[in-house]
Amino acid sequence: MKLFLIPLISFLYIAISNAENKECPIMVGDEIDEEEVVEFEGKKVYFCCTACVKIWDKNPKYIIKAMPKLLPQFSGMDEKLGLDKVELLDQRMRPVYNERLVTPDSPTVEVEGKTVYLYNKSALRRFNKSPEKYIEKAIKEGLLPQLAKKG
């Protein structure tokens, strides 16, 4: 029985360490483009577009910690990457383009004395045209916990 477990455990370890992301970890739900790839800590990470690669380049460890299910290639590497030192924002997704991940480097706007993270200048323009609409919808969807908190 022990002889059987060694190859099985080895296979699982290799499979996990060779895992790759199947969708973009920043524009969640978007298919990856095999040409939009970076290597980080010896692992390939695929994205849907160049814009996401640029976002990744600014803060890869934040994205790994925020989206572990979408980045299986980094499973079990928390200590090596120092992810315990990475502090996640309360807000994970954007209120205007809500399928997109926010990072500490995302553009921001102040709402009720709290910082709300957006995607880009276009999102800021859309948000500013009807902030109440986006805030109300995002709070209902649980996207703006910093505004939903009472106290």
Residue ranges and their predicted role:
Residues 1-3, 29:
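N-terminal leader/targeting segments
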Residues 3-14:
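Sec-dependent N-terminal signal peptides
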Residues 17-151:
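Intrinsically disordered, low-complexity terminal tails/loops enriched in metal-binding residues
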